[in-house]
Amino acid sequence: MLTLLSPAKKLLSISKHYSKKTSNPLLLDKALELVKIMKLKSAEQIADLMDLSRQLAELNYERYQNFDLKNNPMNHSYPALFLFQGDVYQGLNANSWKDEEIEYAQSHLGILSGLYGFLRPLDRIQPYRLEMGVKLENPAGKNLYAFWSKIVTNILNQILAEQSNPVLINLASTEYFKVVDEKKLSYPLVTINFYEQKNSELKMIGILAKKARGMMAKYIMQNRIDSIEQIKEFSESGYLFNKEISSPNSLNFIRIH
């Protein structure tokens, strides 16, 4: 099984070099094509492109100006699993993982990325911001979906082909998963959703769903889950699988308040 997550906007402030084993992003050459486009943007253009405040636009302008095109491991880079710090990654809590769990995740967990396309947990990346939904003109078209769709779908098929149970588990957001061409996927796809129930009303609440996705990914990696039936047994933080509102391709979990 291969589990997919979205990245995060909030990043770790890198204060020291990561000294353990890391890997190079699989699609680094393509990512650098986008970096070269972003290096030509002014802070004002970055603000317009991503609807950012002046302060955030300046930060990301500096990030792209300082981006090392040679991807030198000593040059402000860090493993994706630890660099991302948003709600999903709070649920994932990777700092609590054992080395063997991280090693297992390296071939069973993927992170979709607007800049890097697809990342493995230990892939060394530089701080950046570039959401998948951004309308950045590039040689392939008017947005990042045009740039990444075929490439990312192909890499997913390649990785799934190496799995003992080749099923794609989608824990990514709609914005990011749209980059995957489902018609070109060669293997089954299962999407997992999390809902809150209060007074018989079901709601998906963004921040809570994000944390739950991270918790589910952690559960799958730490327990080396390799079947849908095992996924259904997830019960952290009060979430329980609901058979009535689920289907073979959509597993839905509910937490009752």
From Swiss-Prot:
Name of the protein: UPF0246 protein lpl1317
Alphabetical list of Pfam families matching this protein: H2O2_YaaD
Family matches, as PANTHER family: PEROXIDE STRESS RESISTANCE PROTEIN YAAA (PTHR30283:SF4), PEROXIDE STRESS RESPONSE PROTEIN YAAA (PTHR30283)
Species whose genome carries this gene: Legionella pneumophila (strain Lens)
GO biological process assignments: response to hydroperoxide
Superkingdom: Bacteria
GO cellular component terms, A-Z: cytosol
Cystine pairs: none
Recorded family membership: Belongs to the UPF0246 family.
